[in-house]
Each structure stands twice: as structure tokens, then as C-alpha cells.
Amino acid sequence: MSLEPKIPLPNSLQKPLSRFYEYLRSEKGLSLHTQRNYKQQLETMAAHLVTLGLKDWSQVDAAWVRQLASKGMREGMKASSIATRLSSLRSFFDFLVLRGEMTANPAKGVSAPRKQRPLPKNLDVDEVGQLLDVNEDDPLSIRDRAMMEVMYGAGLRLAELVGINLKDVLGRQGEIRVIGKGDKERKAPFSGLAKEWVDKWLKVRGALASPGETALFVSKLGTRISHRSVQKRMEEWGKKQSVASHISPHKLRHSFATHVLESSQNLRAVQELLGHENISTTQVYTHLDFQHLAQAYDQAHPRARKKNKD
């Protein structure tokens, strides 16, 4: 959507705008800069109305305002810019309602998209391979590789990884039972390499675990490993394996999502695998059955196939 309207506005659209500009100048006392911003935003939207065949502001409804916000998102506008555009519309329609030219403000209930936090830069497949190429045979190294393989193989959150109990490893099915946000349980697939290293870890876990400890991954003290310990160990392995990027549990999860999405182009499957209720602020949760998820996972995940058996 261009910043300046290229289409002449009919009087039915232009005159209410002119009255509003005068109101901003004489009664609101806004600066020239702010007035120009209002003018730019509103006349751009008025030109868009003309392209849709609308000739009067009273024809605008909430659906049109939402479509306008969505259009801005599709065109790559920043969330803050869309919020400014909606704010201009709300102020203008409040003015028209006050003057009796409209009965209600159609922009009143339309929210601007939330400003999203930037996602961390993901590791590429080669960097993941470099990080996970841990072949030391002491119990802590085996544990650490198993943790990283599971986190990347299933796209788990840090809390989900730490919360896994022995009973949650469903080896025959190639699944791990995890408790996600809101205490919601789901079964996550994990790759052949992740399963291979979990099996190796289980063989040496007894050397560290305290009697009766139910956690899959334990610390040197024999109890469930802490969030901070996982973060610290991953950072250390990133440096030891000479991976250029800073390593964090969330970066592994983000890398999982990016790699599977790039391979499968199946956004809904990735949504389900990650345990997300909402795929974005504009998309609702779509459930896929586990068989379809597992199939998409097996075909797409770069470490999903175990090496040829001996």
C-alpha cells in the first residue's frame, strides 16, 4: 500500500477528512508533524476505499478495518506502524460519531498485532551436526549428547526436557511423553539418533542417579538436572565443538522448527510438534492426528533416520 494516495478522493470522503484536519488544528492543538501523520495515514486508507468501490466513510465496518490491518501485515509493515494506522482511524471515526455522521466507531474493537520478539538466529544443519558430534564416553558427555539430541530431535522446550521422567520414554513407539505449557501433555517423536543416545545414557545413568530418582536426566548430584545446568552445559559444548553461534536450548528448538519447516513445508505439523496452541496471532490451532505428524517428521527431520544397523 503506497504512502501517498494516487487516486483522487470523492467529496464524500475528502470533506469529512478536511473537517477532521481543522478539528485537529484548532481544537486539539496538535503539532504540524502530527497533523501531517494523520493526513498521510487517513488519505492512504481513503484511497484504498476508493479502489474497493466504497464512496462514503459510513460504509466502513469492522471487517474492513481488520482486513486493512491484515493487508499491512502481508506487506511487511511493522506492528507499530499498523498500530499507528489503526489509532488514526479510531480518532477519525470518534470525530465522525461525535458529529453524528456515524453511529458507531468500526475501528474501536480492532486490535493492532502484537509486537513479536525477534526469534534467535537458528543453527544451520551443518552447525547442528558439528555441535552434536560428541563422541566422548564418560557418563556426563553421554548424558549431554542425549539431551541435545532429544531437544533438537523433538523440538522440546527446556522445561519439557528437564521434566521428562523415565516412564515417559516410550522406546518401542519412538515417542517421548512431555508436559508442555499449561500442563498439557503431548507425545513428541524423537529421531533415531536421539533414541540411540538415550539408550546409551540409560546404560550409564545408574552411575550418577540417586536411588529412586525418577528423572530421565540427572546431575552429578544424582537428582533431576536443573534448567541452568542444561543451559551451561550446552554453552560449554558450543565452545568445545567450535560452533560459531552462541548455543542455547531455545536456539536448538528454533533450529528444529526451521529445519523441519524448510524440508516439509507443513506449517501445521510443525505447530503441533512444537506444542503450540496458536501458529501466530492470526491463525488458530489446527489439530493433526499423530500418525500424520510422525510421517511428516520422519520424512522431513534431518536426523530422523538412524544409521544402517550392523
UniProtKB/Swiss-Prot annotation:
Q: Which GO terms describe its molecular function?
A: DNA binding; tyrosine-based site-specific recombinase activity
Keyword Phosphoprotein set for record: no
Keywords on record: Cell cycle, Cell division, Chromosome partition, Cytoplasm, DNA integration, DNA recombination, DNA-binding
Quote the function comment for this protein: Site-specific tyrosine recombinase, which acts by catalyzing the cutting and rejoining of the recombining DNA molecules. The XerC-XerD complex is essential to convert dimers of the bacterial chromosome into monomers to permit their segregation at cell division. It also contributes to the segregational stability of plasmids.
- The molecule here is called Tyrosine recombinase XerC
**In which family does this protein belong, per the annotation?**
Belongs to the 'phage' integrase family. XerC subfamily.
Instruction: List the GO cellular component terms.
Output: cytoplasm
UniProt lineage: Bacteria, Pseudomonadati, Pseudomonadota, Gammaproteobacteria, Vibrionales
Q: What positions does UniProt annotate as the active site of this protein?
A: 157, 181, 250, 253, 276, 285 (o-(3'-phospho-dna)-tyrosine intermediate)
Pfam families, A to Z: Phage_int_SAM_1, Phage_integrase
